[in-house]
Amino acid sequence: MNHKLPQHIAVVMDGNGRWAESRGLPRVEGHKAGLDSVKKIINCCLEKKISCLSLFAFSSENWSRPVTEVNFLMELFLEALRKEIDDLNQHGIRLKFTGDREPLSQVLQKQMYDAEALTRNNQQLILNVVVNYGGKWDIVTAAKKLIHSVLDGKLACDEINEAVFAQFLDTSGMPEPDLFIRTSGELRISNFFLWQLAYTELYFTDVHWPDFNEHEFELALTSFARRARRFGQISQSE
């Protein structure tokens, strides 16, 4: 493709459970199948030299799912990290994790820290795995940090603007997403990157995540390329 490409893509990987249930399989089989789609999309981003890919792996609301499913997801995440980290590193991928790590197991937290440390200097692609995250949590946490900076005398109230506030978000240092993709037919962002998606192009597809392949990714990119991003301004044709 010769058309313009997004540099940061954020994805809500929805429909693993529904994919499995539609095939008469346990929901956990859908989560396993979803890992294959993750690998495919990472490879697509590498081929197209996209700078950053954010994957919404587990939201703060997902704790309300059945305990057995939550435990399986955490074990699957840990296992995938251990299994794939060397390959990700060899391909020049830098791993980052966004979200509240405190409720996660110490073993998982250490694996995340080690993965970030190992890949810190890689530059081919930033793979931002979003775990135990909520957009409201991110904004509230950022506000608390900002207040402490003001009280500590490190920041004056008059210095606070949107750019300064963004530095206190958990995504600090990353560009805001150009393209948001959500699979499985849900038409909402579900408390994901509430601040960061202000001017992001939204793309929704009925395809469940395990069926989201290279062709489906191309369709999303084609849709993005056809859009005129105005950022609140008037386009040149108007």
Swiss-Prot record:
Its cofactor is Mg(2+). This is Ditrans,polycis-undecaprenyl-diphosphate synthase ((2E,6E)-farnesyl-diphosphate specific). Disulfide bonds: none annotated. Mg(2+) binds at D14, E201. Homodimer. It comes from the Bacteria. It is an enzyme of class 2 (transferase). The gene is uppS. One of its GO terms (cellular component) is cytosol. It comes from Legionella pneumophila (strain Paris). Its EC number is 2.5.1.31. Pfam families: Prenyltransf. Catalyzes the sequential condensation of isopentenyl diphosphate (IPP) with (2E,6E)-farnesyl diphosphate (E,E-FPP) to yield (2Z,6Z,10Z,14Z,18Z,22Z,26Z,30Z,34E,38E)-undecaprenyl diphosphate (di-trans,octa-cis-UPP). UPP is the precursor of glycosyl carrier lipid in the biosynthesis of bacterial cell wall polysaccharide components such as peptidoglycan and lipopolysaccharide. GO terms for molecular function: ditrans,polycis-undecaprenyl-diphosphate synthase [(2E,6E)-farnesyl-diphosphate specific] activity; magnesium ion binding. Keywords: Cell shape, Cell wall biogenesis/degradation, Magnesium, Metal-binding, Peptidoglycan synthesis, Transferase. NCBIfam families: PRK14830.1, uppS. Binds 2 magnesium ions per subunit.
